[in-house]
Amino acid sequence: MSIETLLEAARFLEWQAQQQQRAREEQERLRLEREREREQEQKRASNLARLAHALPVEEPRIEAPPLPLSPPAPPPAPPPPLATPAPLTVIPIPVVTNSPQSLPPPPPLPPAAQPLPLAPRQPALVSTPGLSIKEPVTLPTRPQVPTPAPLLPDAKTTVAPTGSPKPLQPLPAPILTIAPHPGVQPQLAPQQPPPPTLGTLKLAPAEEAKSSEQKKRPGGIGTREVHNKLEKNRRAHLKECFETLKRNIPNVDDKKTSNLSVLRTALRYIQSLKRKEKEYEHEMERLAREKIATQQRLAELKHELSQWMDVLEIDRVLRQTGQPEDDQASTSTASEGEDNVDEEMEGDRAGLGPPKLNHRPQPELLKSALPTPSTAPAPLPTHPHPHPHPVALSPAHLPVQQQQPPQQKTPLPAPPPPPATPTQTLVPAPAHLVATAGGGSTVIAHTATTHASVIQTVNHVLQGPGGKHIAHIAPSAPSPAVQLAPATPPIGHITVHPATLNHVAHLGSQLPLYPQPVAVSQPVAVSHIAHTLSHQQVNGTAGLGPPATVMAKPAVGAQVVHHPQLVGQTVLNPVTMVTMPSFPVSTLKLA
């Protein structure tokens, strides 16, 4: 039971005890009042009997008119009980009024003896002082009646009307003595049952409390079950939380662990993580400060470098720093005894400036800023030639068109052109370097004239997939051949021309260039082959030797173009530049 129910029960018991005590007091007071009323009625009856025998009948008729004036007196009667001296004179008036009011009913009894009942009217007024003297005994009881309980004023009020409205019942004096008793008794009868009603009222709340307790008990049982379920769920949730915490904490024994130990280890682990976080923050701050200092130092060094170092030296330093990468990117040469050519190339490079090409990292060819494969071809600045006459074309600038019909599989020999072919345009001294417009790769082959059949080939192809080209070059052979076997993508342009690199090599006429058939094989098609040999004659003659053979073998057809061999005095590093689109793997073989 809760505290509220206990308090309610205690209050109910106290209230029940008080009600019982009040009921007892009321019963005692009612009993005393009934006894006093009986005594008063007996006294009144005896007084009336005495007055009836002593007074005549006519006098009360004369005094009858003033009697109606007396009824206004009863209304002030209720308040006077509070003051003891005033009611002594006022209260007897109702007694007088009772007697005259009780007289009107006597007319039905005139034959018996009217003077007897009418006589008391006058003596009532006469005997009022006597009554007032006798009734002080009852007056002290009346003021006590209204004060103790609320039921007493009810009884008194009922008694007062018995004197005023119910005087009809007591006709003669003896009847008056008898009538008040039944009038008082019926009042007592209903007054006595109220205590049992109080008891019933007392019992009713007790039953209601019991019923409410009984109603609360099943509700309490339900709430207890709900509470148990909630407690079970809470414990399960806590257990799950501890399990997850245990899994997240390292170095925790699974067997002997309590919740307290898990919490302690978790606290230690969290503290260690916080310490590590602070250390990492300090480390990051230190690194940031070092980075700022390093950047400032770098800026200072750059400023100092720009003050005491000119542009040429900076370019040279950059070229030296970039040289290892160029050496690694370039392929090895298969020629023998080419040190002098390398020295000449390095001298030319130093004279013309640093190389600045991304797609063609050969230092020998980077004399000027060449465009990337996606740009248009740009002319190479060459050494001006003293002779105004045009360059003799050893092989004419013959384009080889692609043959679409597959039926033409036999090589079609072309007549050897004269030293100067009028049908083809002459290539001027500044030769043009042809680059593919499709972003293709480039194969550059240098031909050195130190030996008749020694060719220095630098094969460096920059392409998307990242494949490499293999360059195989064999020294002197009677008929060396350059064989290009790329993958499926077609070759854009093949241009063979000697580049004038500000260097003139004086060679003897006894060094002929042997006939060199060049075979270019490709599975798809050869779009354009331009084989140009432009030569500048200086103090010598150019003789035409046996013709070399250029064989183009596409998948759908073939053409054979013969060109005479060039034998002259001044041949400067003929450059074979093969420009082709990107393809995965190809082989450049010179055998």
UniProtKB/Swiss-Prot annotation:
CDD domains: bHLHzip_Mnt (cd11402). Binds DNA as a heterodimer with MAX and represses transcription. Binds to the canonical E box sequence 5'-CACGTG-3' and, with higher affinity, to 5'-CACGCG-3'. The keyword Transport does not apply. One of its GO terms (cellular component) is nucleus. This is Max-binding protein MNT. Efficient DNA binding requires dimerization with another bHLH protein. Binds DNA as a homodimer or a heterodimer with MAX. Residues 273-301 are annotated as: Leucine-zipper. The modification N-acetylserine is found at residue 2. SMART domains: HLH (SM00353). Residues 63-84, 102-120, 374-383, 412-421 have a biased composition (Pro residues). Residues 336-346 have a biased composition (Acidic residues). Residues 390-411 have a biased composition (Low complexity). The keyword Acetylation applies. Residues 17-122, 182-223, 321-426 are annotated as: Disordered. GO terms for biological process: cellular senescence; negative regulation of apoptotic signaling pathway; regulation of cell cycle; regulation of DNA-templated transcription. Residues 22-44, 205-216 have a biased composition (Basic and acidic residues). Residues 222-273 form the bHLH domain. Keywords: Acetylation, DNA-binding, Nucleus, Repressor, Transcription, Transcription regulation. The lineage of its organism: Eukaryota, Metazoa, Chordata, Craniata, Vertebrata. It is found in: Nucleus. GO terms for molecular function: chromatin binding; DNA binding; DNA-binding transcription factor activity; DNA-binding transcription repressor activity, RNA polymerase II-specific; identical protein binding; protein dimerization activity; RNA polymerase II transcription regulatory region sequence-specific DNA binding. PROSITE patterns: BHLH. PANTHER family: MAX DIMERIZATION, MAD (PTHR11969), MAX-BINDING PROTEIN MNT (PTHR11969:SF99). InterPro entries: bHLH_dom, HLH_DNA-bd_sf.
